[in-house]
Amino acid sequence: MSHNSFGHLFRVTTWGESHGPAIGCVVDGCPPRLPLSEADIQPWLDRRRPGQSKFTTQRQEPDAVEILSGVFEGQTTGTPISLLIRNTDQRSRDYGDIAERYRPGHADVAYDLKYGIRDYRGGGRSSARETAMRVAAGAVARRVLGEGVRIRGALTQIGAHRVDRARWDWDAVDTNPFFCPDPAMVPVWEEYLGAVRKAGSSIGAVIEIVAEGVPAGWGAPVYGKLDSDLAMALMSINAVKGIEIGDGFAAAELTGEENADPMRMVDGRLTFGANHAGGVLGGISTGQPLVARFAVKPTSSILAPVDSVTRGGENVEVSTRGRHDPCVGIRAVPVGEAMMACVLADHFLRHRAQVGP
């Protein structure tokens, strides 16, 4: 299996399976002499860690990260940084019923069609367990970016229930189990998702990621576009089925006058009157907040029987038991933040290499 790496100058390779002994990643291209320790990475992993509420999988994994290389006396050395998380709460027996049966909507059938073999235990390589290492890599990327770039994410929609942007409060995001920026929507989601969970079903969601402090000039025309790389990175997250930058698909309903981001010089500085573009024009950052949204589909592991087939071609029904996220979008918030951080770190280094600091 190829294509387990992404990035150019800041390059991340992840490895491991859901029910293997460990998962890990190698971060290459990190500049030397940056302060880094496990304590800098662990808080970001703790935000994604499973089993923290009844609305996520009850698999209990501490997700304790270990730095194996690339750091000496608390500083990066410029050599590859190897990170490891040991799996401790695998329960492979829960997947015995699907060893020969495909879950409709799950990647296991595509893996089997391509490779002729698949690890059915928890989804193997296609499991969202892999995203823990993206979050770890994202913590390293934040060190590269420094404190001047701030990346935040929030869940904006579960099913048909959307937040009210007039009530948006970033300070509320980490005070509830949903990363919800609208305090009034939290009890609505609790009741709704509680019913979904009790029914053994699942539901999709929309996540928004915003990066502030990104200077103008990151990204390159045509094939090195910042938004193109960001879309690829977010699309690579498990269960993601759609991406928007700025107004995204809503821009198709706007006139040229409505979609324009007016510009003025204020105290010798370029300012914008709106941000429909989401902080990117021509693939290059404008200095405005970088805004991206992505949609995740419902988890394919559900209790209700669904028509499927076996590896041998027999028509069957599949009902999936075990520990699963009723809404995988919740824990996708810190994953989306991490992917944004990795893309920005890569483009920061690429920009510096081409035009200097």
Swiss-Prot record:
The keyword Amino-acid biosynthesis applies. Pathway: Metabolic intermediate biosynthesis; chorismate biosynthesis; chorismate from D-erythrose 4-phosphate and phosphoenolpyruvate: step 7/7. It comes from the Bacteria. The keyword Flavoprotein applies. Its EC number is 4.2.3.5. Reduced FMN (FMNH(2)). FMN binds at residues 125-127, 238-239, 282, 297-301, 323. GO terms for cellular component: cytosol. It catalyses: 5-O-(1-carboxyvinyl)-3-phosphoshikimate = chorismate + phosphate. One of its GO terms (biological process) is amino acid biosynthetic process. Keywords: Amino-acid biosynthesis, Aromatic amino acid biosynthesis, FAD, Flavoprotein, FMN, Lyase, NADP. Its cofactor is FMNH2. PROSITE patterns: CHORISMATE_SYNTHASE_1, CHORISMATE_SYNTHASE_2, CHORISMATE_SYNTHASE_3. It is an enzyme of class 4 (lyase). One of its GO terms (molecular function) is chorismate synthase activity. InterPro entries: Chorismate_synth, Chorismate_synth_AroC_sf, Chorismate_synthase_CS. NADP(+) binds at residue 48. This reaction introduces a second double bond into the aromatic ring system. Belongs to the chorismate synthase family. PANTHER family: CHORISMATE SYNTHASE. Homotetramer. HAMAP family: Chorismate_synth (MF_00300). NCBIfam families: aroC (TIGR00033), PRK05382.1 (NF003793). This is Chorismate synthase. The gene is aroC.
